[in-house]
């Protein structure tokens, strides 16, 4: 494979550990609570949670496959019957054992779960968990058809119509997640059963898709296969998988539009009139080739997955036009469509991007999966071009929206991540019905919970990459742990200490692995440690916060927001960093109408918010004292506390329940004032204007990821100034 554009590549997961209290705690939570909980959810064993039907479907498909093998030519396969985008049983307590239930993409619940399992087993071998996973894999593989096809929706509903609705029915999306899960499990355990199944499915897809006559000229409706195929190519060494990924990226949006041809054919076969005005192929990023796209449009998760896959292909092929397209779409997202919490996708209509600068707070969609997809895109752009802005955005998406998607006890989840919540509006205003004031135990469309689990268990792969020159280690995120890398022919160990995200203080200790010739104190090794200079610390002006103990001979070069420290490193050398972490009072671009006259507070990678439990009801009457804060930033108090989470259930199904959790955290206390609710004013709907009477107070702000862990109450990120 050519790697013209490639500058660095991810470090192997087993070569990086996380030990700091922040991320290690979350990985342990996923390992001990979330993974077992989600396995129960996949098997419909969580009381009060929406059924998944995921493993039910695999078992049904496996049973049908066994029947086929037993009966041979006498077997009569099901003939396709459309049962809707989501099929539910008449009696949820007694689903038919041979029917498919759930959404068309329900298989991916397993795939993301097994991916998280693989990541967890990499650093925490667990015989019981591995046995459970092996049993699940046996069931899944038993559902695979002899030709390699593996999607239970069509296996159970009728293979005569498979690959006829790529736009909506997610077969290639299911393949992509299956493949990523299979790779993670193989890399953790060395077991190939699921990986071989993924390869057989990939081989079948490769035999059916392409530009040659007789092949399907289509591409995924919901993207992720592109990333998965590149990863599969790099895992197996099979170039044709990377070629198929490139085909999907380049073919998308070419004339004639494949989805339009597909829609017309299906309408004709179903005896319907084709209605072109009802179609919006931009929603699928398929109205034009990516090299002609200038704006991030459509379903936010699909879009960011597509851009990440395109970046992978640009990296492999060295295609400068494709890379320029990725850069152009990145700029549109971060300059005009990105929430301060690292979320994307402003509207619930299609879970999609809205128009430029349309970033409502109380109706924000900001899906958890979309923030994760943005992190995927950012990491791949970092591999091509180590620019700190990619890591800045990636960090924000991970620390804010991604973590907000999961309760602090790991037992409930947000699909949607608003920046302002009034519970009554959520309950009574249908326009805000998608916004939930408390997390849910599970979802019928449960893409987000296992997505959060897999990225948390894999987060260290976002922290580091290794330069393709084999002599540079990039540090993109600051989390405590250990990193092993071969640099300039020497096996190097870096031990990272970090107090993130509460302070910018930490260190990187250099060591040489035992048995390497450089482990002798008289030896050294020449390589580069490239440290990101975070935007929240001042960017490149923060380079003075980095020192190398007793080593004036280490060269220092700043480029694209990274400080490159190069020299002959000795065993025991230590790099210290103490990045400033001021509180930033942030205003949105004036074109963001919803934030006019408002401010938000950011410290380090964290966005902060106000909750009613700390600040009282009617948060719209609470103002930040912007004049005082601007004139004296020291008036904002930064406090290290123990945050007490916990909430009782709101109903017999356990909605809103959060187990008692005590967690170290930082809060902000800012000068503020409240509008006094004058009875003469509030008794009338309208009245003559007069200046609001002010009551001086303070406002307590908590990290955004921690909101809704103390029961149902108001929340806002932006405060009136």
Predicted regions and their residues:
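Well-ordered alpha-helical scaffold segments within catalytic/enzyme domains
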Residues: 23, 114-127, 176-191, 225-238, ...
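C-terminal beta-rich recognition modules with glycine/proline-rich loops and embedded aromatic residues
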Residues: 15, 21, 245, 326, ...
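Hydrophobic core segments within long, regular secondary-structure runs in both alpha-
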Residues: 20, 27, 39, 55, ...
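Carbohydrate-binding/catalytic loop surfaces
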Residues: 52, 56-102, 151-170, 220-232, ...
């Amino acid at each position: 494979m050519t790697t013209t554009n490639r500058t660095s590549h991810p470090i192997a997961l087993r070569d990086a550990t996380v030990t700091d209290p922040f991320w290690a705690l979350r990985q342990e939570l996923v390992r001990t609570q979330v993974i077992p909980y989600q396995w129960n959810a996949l098997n419909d064993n969580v009381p009060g949670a929406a059924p998944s039907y995921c493993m039910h479907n695999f078992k049904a498909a496996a049973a049908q496959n066994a029947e086929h093998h037993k009966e041979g030519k006498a077997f009569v396969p099901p003939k396709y019957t459309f049962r809707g985008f989501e099929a539910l049983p008449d009696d949820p307590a007694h689903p038919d054992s041979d029917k498919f239930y759930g959404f068309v993409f329900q298989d991916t619940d397993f795939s993301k779960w097994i991916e998280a399992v693989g990541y967890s087993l990499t650093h925490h071998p667990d015989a019981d968990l591995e046995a459970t996973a092996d049993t699940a894999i046996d069931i899944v593989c038993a559902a695979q058809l002899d030709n390699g096809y593996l999607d239970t929706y069509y296996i159970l509903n009728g293979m005569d119509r498979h690959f006829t609705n790529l736009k909506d029915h997610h077969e290639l999306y299911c393949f992509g997640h299956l493949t990523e899960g299979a790779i993670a499990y193989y890399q953790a355990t060395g077991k190939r059963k699921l990986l071989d199944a993924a390869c057989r499915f990939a081989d079948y897809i490769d035999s059916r898709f392409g530009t040659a006559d007789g092949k399907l000229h289509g591409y995924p409706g919901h993207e992720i296969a592109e990333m998965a195929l590149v990863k599969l190519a790099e895992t197996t060494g099979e170039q044709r998988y990377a070629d198929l990924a490139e085909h999907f990226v380049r073919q998308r949006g070419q004339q004639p539009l494949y989805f339009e041809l597909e829609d017309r054919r299906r309408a004709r076969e179903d005896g319907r009139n084709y209605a072109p005005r009802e179609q919006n192929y931009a929603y699928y990023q398929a109205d034009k080739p990516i090299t002609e796209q200038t704006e991030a449009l459509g379903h936010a998760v699909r879009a960011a997955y597509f851009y990440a896959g395109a970046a992978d292909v640009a990296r492999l092929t060295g295609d400068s036009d494709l890379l320029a397209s990725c850069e152009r779409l990145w700029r549109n997202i971060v300059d005009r469509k990105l929430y301060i919490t690292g979320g994307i996708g402003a509207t619930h209509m299609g879970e999609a991007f809205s128009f430029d600068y349309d970033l409502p707070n109380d109706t924000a969609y900001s899906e958890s999966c979309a923030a994760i997809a943005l992190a995927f895109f950012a990491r791949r752009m970092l591999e091509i071009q180590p620019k700190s802005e990619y890591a800045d955005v990636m960090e924000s998406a991970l620390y804010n929206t991604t973590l907000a998607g999961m309760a602090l006890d790991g037992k409930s989840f947000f699909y949607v991540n608003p920046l302002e919540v009034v519970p009554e509006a959520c309950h009574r205003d249908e326009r805000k019905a998608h916004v939930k004031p408390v997390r849910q135990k599970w979802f019928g469309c449960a893409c987000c919970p296992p997505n959060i689990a897999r990225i948390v268990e894999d987060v260290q792969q976002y922290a580091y990459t290794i330069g393709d020159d084999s002599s540079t280690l990039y540090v993109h995120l600051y989390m405590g742990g250990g990193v092993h890398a071969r640099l300039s022919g020497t096996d190097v160990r870096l031990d990272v200490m970090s107090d993130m995200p509460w302070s910018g203080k930490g260190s990187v200790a250099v060591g040489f692995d035992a048995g390497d010739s450089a482990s002798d104190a008289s030896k050294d090794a020449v390589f580069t440690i490239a440290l990101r200079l975070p935007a929240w610390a001042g960017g490149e002006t923060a380079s003075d916060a980095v020192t190398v103990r007793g080593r004036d001979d280490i060269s220092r070069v700043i480029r694209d927001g990274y400080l490159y420290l190069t020299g002959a490193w000795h065993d025991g050398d230590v790099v210290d960093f103490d990045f400033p972490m001021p509180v930033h009072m942030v205003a949105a671009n004036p074109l963001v109408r919803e934030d006019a006259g408002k401010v938000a507070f950011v410290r380090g990678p964290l966005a902060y918010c106000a909750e009613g439990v700390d600040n009282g009801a009617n948060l719209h009457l609470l103002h930040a004292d912007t004049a005082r804060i601007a004139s004296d930033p020291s008036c904002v108090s930064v406090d290290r506390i123990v945050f007490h989470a916990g909430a009782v259930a709101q109903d017999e199904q356990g909605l809103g329940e959060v187990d008692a959790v005590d967690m170290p955290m930082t809060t902000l206390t800012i000068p503020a004032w409240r509008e006094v609710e004058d009875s003469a004013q509030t008794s009338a709907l309208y009245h003559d204007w007069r200046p609001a009477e002010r009551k001086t107070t303070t406002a307590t702000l908590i990290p955004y990821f921690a909101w809704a862990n103390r029961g149902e109450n108001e929340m806002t990120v932006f405060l009136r100034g």
